[in-house]
């Protein structure tokens, strides 16, 4: 425990990035949606950070949703989606600014950043988006580019405020969405990479989240291996088989995060059951590792489960 007291959470998170020196401390963090906005969201994030003892402040992107003034009924309508100015993101920037002020001296501030695809499926139902991509990918791409440029405005503003990094998400390539590689590359990966390469140029600590909330992936390695991110938060399965954290580290050749099922013992069990599940992950975890879940945990997950699991990670190698 001496190392924990001697080093700040910021320092301990940075040590995970050093692939040449396995750290003796395993950071940990779990995320949930709080269902509130504004000052209530500031308080909810801070209360959760301190109650769980997690190693960084991860800010949700729940302050606003992309809504279109003109309906998107055909692929050609995607070109009507405007490029949103920085001012449109003010509710999210307000939350970020206040959390930076309150917690940055203590821990890294990591802002969730939805992908262009994730924002697009706020504007229309996901099945409409997928249908439009299959009908006319080039037309849809015009709207995806505008959404990407909008998100770049948010990234630039967040970087100026002093955010340490982003929790960068990708979706859309699932077997039940846009699995076709050519369509995926044109309408999803092209814009993910455009956005996330800019992110990596502006802030130092980015976590790439490959989200399987909507479905599973085939061709996982070739689809995602070249995505940017200092750390990769991976699903628990890919290509119809389990994906261990050690195997994920071999694929991405950088630190990985995850290991626990978001709706498993961490959300629904007792503290002892949550710790037992975490222990199995820690036994085979790669050297450079952050314990977490495959996505957000249940909003009613017991704080005692989360804190017990995080404490176990902190003490596992010390």
Feature names for model-found ranges:
Residues 15-80:
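N-terminal capping/small domains of soluble enzymes
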Residues 1-31, 44, 55, 84-318:
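Active-site loop segments of alpha/beta catalytic cores
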């Amino acid at each position: 425990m001496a190392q924990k007291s001697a080093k700040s959470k910021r320092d301990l998170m940075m040590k995970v990035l050093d692939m040449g020196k396995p750290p003796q401390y395993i950071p940990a963090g779990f995320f949930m949606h709080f269902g509130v906005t504004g000052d209530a969201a500031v308080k909810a994030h801070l209360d959760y950070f301190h109650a769980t003892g997690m190693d960084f402040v991860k800010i949700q992107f729940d302050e606003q949703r992309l809504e279109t003034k003109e309906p998107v009924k055909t692929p050609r309508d995607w070109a009507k989606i405007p490029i949103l100015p920085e001012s449109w993101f003010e509710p999210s920037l307000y939350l970020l600014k206040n959390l930076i002020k309150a917690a940055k001296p203590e821990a890294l501030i990591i802002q969730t950043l939805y992908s262009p695809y994730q924002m697009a499926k706020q504007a229309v139902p996901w099945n409409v988006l997928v249908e439009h991509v299959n009908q006319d990918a080039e037309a849809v791409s015009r709207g995806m580019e505008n959404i990407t440029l909008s998100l770049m405005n948010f990234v630039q503003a967040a970087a100026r405020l002093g955010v340490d990094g982003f929790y960068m998400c990708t979706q859309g390539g699932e077997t039940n969405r846009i699995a076709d590689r050519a369509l995926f590359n044109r309408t999803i990966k092209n814009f993910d990479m455009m956005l996330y390469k800019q992110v990596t140029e502006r802030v130092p600590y980015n976590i790439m989240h490959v989200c399987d909330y909507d479905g599973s992936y085939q061709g996982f390695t070739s689809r995602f291996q070249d995505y940017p991110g200092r750390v990769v938060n991976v699903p628990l399965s890919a290509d119809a088989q389990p994906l261990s954290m050690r195997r994920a580290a071999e694929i991405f050749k950088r630190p990985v995060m995850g290991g626990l099922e978001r709706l498993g013992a961490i959300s629904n069990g007792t503290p002892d059951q949550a710790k037992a599940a975490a222990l199995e992950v820690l036994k085979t975890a790669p050297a450079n590792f952050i314990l977490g879940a495959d996505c957000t945990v249940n909003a009613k997950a017991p704080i005692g489960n989360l804190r017990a699991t995080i404490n176990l990670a902190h003490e596992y190698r010390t």
